From Swiss-Prot:
InterPro entries in alphabetical order: P-loop_NTPase (IPR027417), RapZ-like (IPR005337), RapZ-like_N (IPR053930), RapZ_C (IPR053931)
Family: Belongs to the RapZ-like family.
Binding site for GTP: 64-67
Organism: Desulfitobacterium hafniense (strain Y51)
One GO molecular-function entry: GTP binding
Protein name, per record: Nucleotide-binding protein DSY4845
Function: Displays ATPase and GTPase activities.
Residues where ATP binds: 13-20
Keywords noted in UniProt: ATP-binding, GTP-binding, Nucleotide-binding
Keyword Nucleotide-binding tagged: yes
């Protein structure tokens, strides 16, 4: 049956237990995510996923008190999913009363079941109302002693695929400093200290993707030593980014105009990442701009 091709994860549980962080983690794993979906729309949502021509194979939704219809209709919606042949799992998040009270006080938000105050009373009321739903959950996570980052990592380990949870998506972008540093860069490399092919007439119209330009740059011992040491640094730090739960890293490589040196170094970094099976992309932001006639490199 077509509908069985979509894996649906329903996230629910106590208010303040970390459902938003869990959903964000799943989004990083490639899930199509919807927050605060009313139970009456769950079946329709699942049907739409099956009509995506394979673009949506995993989806996650959060159903909680904000949905308005409350959980009395959630059981009915899940029953409809089962009858229609959809595979779904329930992730139930909870935490101790003490921890939840502390989180509400820290955020200065009101509990949805106690709009006039009385945080603890609202928590206890909600816990009682969710007893039956908790009993049918496929997985229960107690977030009392978890930081947001630890929760995201635990969700990724439980519901992410092996490739997404074990690898980091790395974007390498070369650029020219005179056109400004990309705003989303995490790691920045300035390679303006390397020999500049711009001052070699036959290399000037080429970019750092061309073998002649790369040979010129890496024939310099300093350039080769720099690349070797930087790749060694990446070899060391990337696994720690993965362990910490980071899913996307942007490495910016800049030279004056973004045509020669930064492009060549970015290409070498991209090859390194590809050889180690990281999800990666290389973009040369300013190389084409310079080839159109900008004389300052």
């Amino acid at each position: 049956m077509l509908s069985k091709q979509v894996r649906l994860l329903v996230i629910t549980g106590l208010s303040g237990a970390g459902k938003t962080q869990a959903l964000q983690s799943l989004e990083d794993q490639g899930y199509f995510c919807v927050d605060n979906l009313p139970p009456s729309l769950i079946l329709k949502f699942a049907e739409l996923c099956t009509q995506s021509q394979g673009k949506v194979t995993r989806a996650a939704i959060v159903c909680d008190l904000r949905g308005g219809e409350f959980f009395s209709s959630l059981a009915e919606a899940l029953g409809d999913l089962h009858r229609e042949g959809f595979h779904y799992e329930i992730l139930f998040l909870e935490a101790s009363d003490e921890v939840l009270v502390g989180r509400y006080k820290e955020s200065r938000r009101r509990h949805p079941l106690s709009p006039s105050g009385g945080i603890l009373e609202g928590i206890q009321m909600e816990r009682q109302m969710l007893t039956e739903l908790r009993g049918v959950a496929h997985k229960i996570m107690d977030t009392s002693n978890l930081s947001s980052q630890q929760l995201r990592h635990q969700v990724a380990e439980s519901f992410g695929n092996e490739q997404a949870s074990g690898h980091l998506a790395v974007s390498v972008v070369s650029f020219g400093f005179k056109y400004a540093i990309p705003l989303d860069v995490d790691l920045l490399i300035d390679v303006r200290f390397l020999p500049n092919p711009f001052y070699v007439a036959e290399l000037r119209p080429l970019t750092g993707e061309h073998p002649q330009v790369q040979d010129y740059i890496f024939s310099n011992p300093v350039a080769q030593e720099f690349v070797d040491k930087y790749l060694g640094l990446l070899e060391f730090i990337l696994p720690y980014y993965v362990k910490e739960g980071k899913r996307h890293l942007v490495i910016g490589v800049g030279c004056t105009g973004g045509q020669h040196r930064s492009v060549a170094i970015a290409e070498r970094i991209g090859l390194f990442l590809q050889e180690r099976s990281y999800m990666m992309s290389v973009k040369h932001r300013d190389a084409a701009r310079n080839r159109k006639g900008d004389k300052s490199k």
